[in-house]
Amino acid sequence: MNPLLSFKDVSKGFEDVQILNEINIDIEPGYFYTLLGPSGCGKTTILKLIAGFEYPDSGDIIYKDKPIGKMPPNKRKVNTVFQDYALFPHLNVFDNIAYGLKLKKLSKSEIKRKVTEALQLVKLSGYEHRQIQGMSGGQKQRVAIARAIVNEPEILLLDESLSALDLKLRTEMQYLLRELQSRLGITFIFVTHDQEEALALSDYIFVMKDGKIQQFGTPIDIYDEPVNRFVADFIGESNIVHGTMVEDFVVNIYGQNFDCVDMGIKENKKVEVVIRPEDISLVSQNDGLFKAKVDSMLFRGVHYEICCKDRKGYEWVIQSTKKANVGSEVGLYFEPEAIHIMVPGETEEEFDKRIESYEDYHHA
């Protein structure tokens, strides 16, 4: 089956600034996708190109096997939920949601039925006659989502839609968005710079930097096997250290050999090693793979964040549910599976091929 939407070598610039560089993406129907990256990486520009608010300088945008790069927004089966909601302040909730349906000249009874259903979906039944000015940020966001889904788009675009909400409301809206996507089966494309939000919501994530896709995959794939230092740093906290591959399944870190699960990398190849803070355990000095001194400890609610310095002066961050005494000598321990090897300069295609070879090896 062909993708619902594809970008084929799409580039876009504004004046002298290149925003997107030969972007290639495929969007399958019925999944929740997230474009994740820092400000200025080009993620919102991709959304604008899908919606038809901007046109590509080069390359093709294909929707259901037809090019739509120059198609006007009103001809696309796409709706957008903006960060600032973009609601009409002079209209009540019902009329805001019904606006697009009235333009389509649907009957009053059909409009009422669709608006009522949309309000039920976003858990705002009974709010039809409320004025927009008197609503909270979370309620306005739900109205904006209802206005989008009532038109039954095939793709729903969400541009930093939760960033203006406080933490509790944002969490509630995350559950609502996942529930809506699952129930309606609409393809969601969500833009955010918040990696925790991306991990919680997405079926698939595109990690972006400087107008290019750095990595595409499921949240678990990207978190567990980042393709490069940028992705490892951007998706969660990481201990990133330099190493050298000794042979298959053995990496040398700062002069000490460690078992790992990586293979297919040239011997003596310089690599970068990622070990997540939650994968490191504080143990007795005798039980540790190496020794370290506790420098500091912060309570983060669900865990303690403990900073240690090993005897060679390198810092390690550990997330633990157990306290540690600042100044104490401890052992640090991690399993071979906790070590993730990154090869500098490796393309995503080369990286994916290497990871697939591990799976083939273990299934052989």
From Swiss-Prot:
Q: Has keyword Cell membrane?
A: yes
Instruction: Give the transmembrane ranges.
Output: none
Q: One GO cellular component from the entry? A: ATP-binding cassette (ABC) transporter complex
Give the matching CDD domains: ABC_PotA_N
Please state every residue range assigned to the domain named ABC transporter: 5-235
Residues recorded as binding ATP, renumbered to this chain, are: 37-44
Query: What SMART domains does the record point to?
Result: AAA (SM00382)
What UniProt keywords are attached to this protein's entry?
ATP-binding, Cell membrane, Membrane, Nucleotide-binding, Translocase, Transport
Q: What is its EC number?
A: 7.6.2.11
The reaction(s) annotated as catalysed by this protein in its Swiss-Prot or TrEMBL entry are: ATP + H2O + polyamine-[polyamine-binding protein]Side 1 = ADP + phosphate + polyamineSide 2 + [polyamine-binding protein]Side 1
| Taxonomic superkingdom | Bacteria
Record Pfam families: ABC_tran, TOBE_2
Q: How does it sit in the membrane?
A: Peripheral membrane protein
The terms under GO molecular function for this entry are:
ABC-type putrescine transporter activity; ATP binding; ATP hydrolysis activity
- Nucleotide-binding among keywords: yes
UniProt xrefs under SUPFAM superfamilies? MOP-like, P-loop containing nucleoside triphosphate hydrolases
Q: Where in the cell is it found?
A: Cell membrane
Record function comment: Part of the ABC transporter complex PotABCD involved in spermidine/putrescine import. Responsible for energy coupling to the transport system.
Q: Which family does it belong to?
A: Belongs to the ABC transporter superfamily. Spermidine/putrescine importer (TC 3.A.1.11.1) family.
Which PANTHER family does the UniProt entry name for this protein? SPERMIDINE/PUTRESCINE IMPORT ATP-BINDING PROTEIN POTA, SPERMIDINE_PUTRESCINE IMPORT ATP-BINDING PROTEIN POTA
What is known about its subunit structure? The complex is composed of two ATP-binding proteins (PotA), two transmembrane proteins (PotB and PotC) and a solute-binding protein (PotD).
Q: What name is this protein filed under?
A: Spermidine/putrescine import ATP-binding protein PotA
Taxonomic source organism? Staphylococcus epidermidis (strain ATCC 35984 / DSM 28319 / BCRC 17069 / CCUG 31568 / BM 3577 / RP62A)
What gene does the UniProt entry assign to this protein? Answer: potA
